[in-house]
């Protein structure tokens, strides 16, 4: 037994001796469902929604009336003065109530807009974890292929058809693949923890994920473009935000005259037994302060919402979705072609070379380039798979929803 074989065995024995954690296979659908319930952004959006809904109540509150009473006794003619005072703004008459209703709808739309971002975040974390798992599996497969050649290499060395250097290099490559796989374990555990946090898992179970393939892309982007134009949650939220800002601006302009106080006056003359009634008012004259700050703030909010809405004009949305679709389709086709055509050719070449070597018709020097090219080809196929998943995620970001939802909607 060579020192390289001893190194390989000791590495695997050491890794097997480490404490193992319970693992659970989590489908993508379950991860998305749990994320919608427990994602930190969802919880924060729910809390923010409750705060905004409570704040709208303050807008509709009308100050309580104030009662002032004075008792005067001038010699033998006591007088009682009563003043009933009600603070008034023009916006109290229906306008604030209307703004509150629109603002409540805007707050709810903003909360719903968080859903698309949460789904994309969970999908990204899920894909990141799968990436590490797949890379570990790739390293394992490479190592197994190398070890499967070891007996043939050893026989060739004994038969004088190869040198010990090639055998040592084979052992070194196998050891490297094993070490690379173990080095990825830290990343796997870290990404499992990140996904667990996003979906609200509190146990110490390590999550194992499945390949997030999803549905195949449609033959054209027409249905996806229509879905994005009609369904984008962020666009709906911006529409409500612009409507709320417009109502707020109208309310601020209405209150340009400033607050007023309406008064009902009553005076009881106890000496003559008469009750004198009167009305009056006080108001701030809009000379220096014309509510410009509130008006400017409301107008800025409205302009900001309108500027953001321009990004979601149908023509722009359609163009972005079309580009994302073409990118995702190209990436997916490249990944499929490489995985189903190129990799099997190199695997077949290695198998043929191994069989020839077993029959004494080949040499170690012929196998080594094939092994290297197969390893490179598998890594390239893996990179193309990642690119395809990333392109799909970007497409779903442009859609404002999951691809499955868009395709299901187009069938109805």
Question: Residue ranges of each PLM-predicted region?
Answer:
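A small-residue-enriched
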Residues: 30-92, 197, 201, 225-310, ...
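Periplasmic alpha-helical coiled-coil/stalk elements that build and connect Gram-negative outer-membrane
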Residues: 117-231, 324-331, 335, 373-374, ...
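Cleaved targeting-peptide boundary
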Residues: 21-29
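Acidic, low-complexity, intrinsically disordered peripheral segments
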Residues: 21, 380-412
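Cleavable N-terminal signal peptides
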Residues: 9, 20-21, 35
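A short glycine-centered flexible hinge/capping loop motif at secondary-structure junctions
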Residues: 156-161, 356-361, 398
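Bacterial N-terminal signal peptides that target proteins for export
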Residues: 1-8
């Amino acid at each position: 037994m060579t020192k390289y074989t001893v190194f390989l065995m000791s590495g695997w024995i050491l890794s097997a001796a480490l404490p193992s954690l319970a693992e659970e296979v989590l489908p993508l659908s379950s991860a998305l469902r749990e994320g919608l319930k427990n994602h930190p952004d969802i919880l924060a959006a729910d809390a923010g929604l409750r705060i905004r809904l409570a704040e709208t109540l303050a807008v509709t509150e009308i100050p309580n009336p104030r009662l002032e009473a004075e008792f005067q006794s001038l010699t033998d003619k006591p007088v009682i003065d009563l003043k009933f005072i009600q603070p008034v703004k023009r916006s109290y008459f229906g306008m604030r109530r209307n703004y509150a209703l629109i603002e409540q709808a805007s707050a709810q739309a903003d909360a719903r807009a968080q859903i698309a971002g949460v789904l994309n975040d969970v999908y990204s974390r899920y894909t990141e974890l799968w990436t590490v798992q797949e890379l570990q599996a790739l390293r394992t497969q490479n190592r197994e292929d190398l070890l499967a050649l070891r007996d043939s290499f050893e026989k060739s060395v004994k038969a004088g058809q190869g040198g010990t250097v090639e055998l040592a290099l084979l052992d070194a490559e196998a050891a490297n693949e094993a070490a690379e796989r173990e080095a990825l374990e830290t990343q796997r555990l870290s990404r499992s923890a990140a996904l667990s946090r996003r979906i609200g898992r509190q146990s110490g179970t390590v999550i194992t994920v499945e390949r997030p393939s999803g549905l195949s892309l449609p033959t054209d982007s027409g249905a996806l473009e229509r879905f994005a134009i009609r369904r984008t949650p962020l666009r709906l939220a911006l529409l409500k935000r612009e409507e709320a800002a417009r109502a707020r601006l109208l309310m601020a302009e209405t209150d340009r005259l400033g607050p007023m106080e309406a008064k009902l006056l009553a005076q009881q003359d106890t000496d003559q037994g008469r009750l004198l009634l009167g009305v009056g008012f006080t108001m701030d004259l809009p000379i220096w302060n014309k509510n410009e700050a509130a008006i400017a703030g409301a107008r800025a909010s409205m302009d900001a919402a309108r500027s953001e809405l321009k990004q979601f004009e149908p023509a722009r949305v359609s163009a972005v979705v079309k580009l994302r679709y073409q990118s995702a389709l190209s990436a997916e086709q490249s990944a499929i072609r490489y995985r189903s055509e190129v990799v099997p050719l190199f695997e077949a070449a290695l198998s043929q070379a191994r069989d020839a070597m077993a029959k004494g018709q080949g040499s170690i020097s012929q196998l080594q380039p094939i092994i290297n090219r197969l390893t490179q080809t598998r890594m390239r196929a893996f990179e193309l798979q990642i690119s395809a998943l990333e392109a799909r995620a970007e497409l779903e970001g442009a859609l404002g929803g999951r691809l499955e939802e868009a395709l299901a909607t187009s069938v109805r």
